[in-house]
Amino acid sequence: MPKLKSVRGAVKRFKKNSSGCFKHKQAYLRHLLTKKSTNRKRNLRFKSIVSKGDKNLVVRCLPYA
């Protein structure tokens, strides 16, 4: 059986941690930042965990993660 290819965009966006969850950078921190509060921007800086409903999609994109 041939090797499965990973989705290259998913490789760049998601990292698997030791507990098997995937972490990713949060959105809404690229532009139009003047109207967003400092507290909101600070919270967006940190990584977020992929939800249970989306985890299977990420796993299918990253077969060897």
Swiss-Prot record:
UniProtKB keywords: Ribonucleoprotein, Ribosomal protein
Matching Pfam families: Ribosomal_L35p
GO cellular component terms listed in the entry, alphabetical order: cytosolic large ribosomal subunit
A GO molecular function held by the record: structural constituent of ribosome
Xref: Gene3D superfamilies: 4.10.410.60
PROSITE patterns: RIBOSOMAL_L35 (PS00936)
Statement: the UniProt record of this protein carries the keyword Ribonucleoprotein: yes
An example Gene Ontology biological process: translation
Keyword Ribonucleoprotein: yes
NCBIfam families: rpmI_bact
Family that this chain belongs to: Belongs to the bacterial ribosomal protein bL35 family.
Protein name (Swiss-Prot/TrEMBL): Large ribosomal subunit protein bL35
